């Protein structure tokens, strides 16, 4: 690569992957993290810095972990010194490997992971080797070594640094966009531009499918609606939430741009696919009260979508850490689907203010929220955890929050 001293900011899962990749290239890796433990447990770095130390000299470029803000003092120091800053996807896209075979990428506000995992499943079930990577769990610099079609989930955090064109993707899709991560990007315009930057990664920009006419690319709505009508005709299929059908059809559209996968194969894949947990996950019922774990709903728009599928007797648990959104836009969906809201966590009072026209009870944490919801519930009601917030006020991840909810729900007796 010709560059010798590279700073890696943030040494979590992605940061360790970045450091490992660079070390294999013979680069001198300078690691920075707020945690001394993280620095001591990363064997790929030659120089270790806590983030409150001064930015080092003679740095060729900086690679930040996806969760590291562009406002991080070391990122700002690099920008002030005209040192290039990038994320792991830019590092990956500069390698020759990404032009060797088909590589697809998906971004959007909601539905990315389900769409990515279904696309991988559809390919494999059709006899086509494929591997999902990126924001879906396996860092891109690790996953790109695997054979088959690359299917990359990309977040706005990773696309925020995309200033140059790296035309490596044979297909791509921007599923949708609504207010999200405004605490990170500063405003909707910056968030929108980060998503649009996916176009800079296309081998042919005309091969980018988009779900919003504000984006540059081919609008996919007509094609997706055609495949949704196809699924609606299949009475043998298990009941599907509308947003799940939508995601599956988006995946099929992207798959068909690369390979001639039949409609029969698509329908069979839909019938046998197991959706990842914490996404409108039905847990069962006890004493006539139903429970749904939708901990992955970390945005207002995701919770709005969830409310479309819960009937009209829901008690909704909201709250956590706000990502820069207002909650008042939930009111129309709540009026149709819910009887009350239980607000918890860091922004509980903010939720209560935004939803002052609706019955809201404020509690401290998830345990109290579930107890409060159960006190209000009668047989036939649905208690749904769909927080519309990040989990980081009280949990390490939405997965941990969802697992706690499942544990709390199942504590008294086995669900039917």
UniProtKB/Swiss-Prot annotation:
Q: What broad class describes the main subcellular location of this protein?
A: cytoplasm
Query: Which residue spans adopt a coiled-coil conformation according to this UniProt entry?
Result: none
Location of this chain's protein in the cell: Cytoplasm
Record key words, sorted: ATP-binding, Cell cycle, Cell division, Cell shape, Cell wall biogenesis/degradation, Cytoplasm, Ligase, Nucleotide-binding, Peptidoglycan synthesis
**Which Pfam families does its entry note?**
Mur_ligase_C (PF02875), Mur_ligase_M (PF08245), MurD-like_N (PF21799)
**A GO MF term:** UDP-N-acetylmuramoylalanine-D-glutamate ligase activity
Q: Which cysteines are joined by disulfide bonds?
A: none
Q: What is its EC number?
A: 6.3.2.9
Enzyme type, top EC level: ligase
Q: Which residues does the record give as ATP binding sites?
A: 108-114
Checking InterPro entries in the record gives: Mur-like_cat_sf, Mur_ligase_C, Mur_ligase_C_dom_sf, Mur_ligase_cen, MurD
Q: Name one GO cellular component term.
A: cytoplasm
Superkingdom, natural source: Bacteria
**Record HAMAP family:** MurD (MF_00639)
Q: Which family does it belong to?
A: Belongs to the MurCDEF family.
Reported function: Cell wall formation. Catalyzes the addition of glutamate to the nucleotide precursor UDP-N-acetylmuramoyl-L-alanine (UMA).
Q: What is this protein called?
A: UDP-N-acetylmuramoylalanine--D-glutamate ligase
Underlying gene:
murD
